[in-house]
Amino acid sequence: MEADLVVGAVLVPGAKAPKLVTNALVAKMKPGSVLVDVAIDQGGCFEDSHATTHADPTFKVHESLFYCVANMPGAVPATSTYALANATIGYALAIANKGWEKAIGEDPSLGYGLNVHDGQIRYAAVAKAHNL
């Protein structure tokens, strides 16, 4: 395997990430390869992944280095908060100004963010992930 860097960024909304890189594949990688599992908050997409911290971010598997820090944006909290606020402020204002029902009626994409309503889980993938 010739990769110096492998970034796993798999997202299945509401579900655990599938394991796409096996231990056997990592064993074939060249020494010093780095694997970054961005999907670690959803369980990780590398077979050997386990959540690490900003204080102790890496571990070795065979001769490769894994970086599996949960909540990676936490390394740059001011920047990540600014980015998240900019990405979500329009939705928040629509809900605040119109109420959630009218806001969803006018912008159906907001409905994809409705996970729980009236005591029921409304998002099938979340219910399935939690066996509910």
What annotation goes with each model-predicted range?
Residues 1-63:
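Rossmann-like adenosine-cofactor binding region
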Residues 40, 45-132:
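Adenosine-phosphate binding glycine-rich loop
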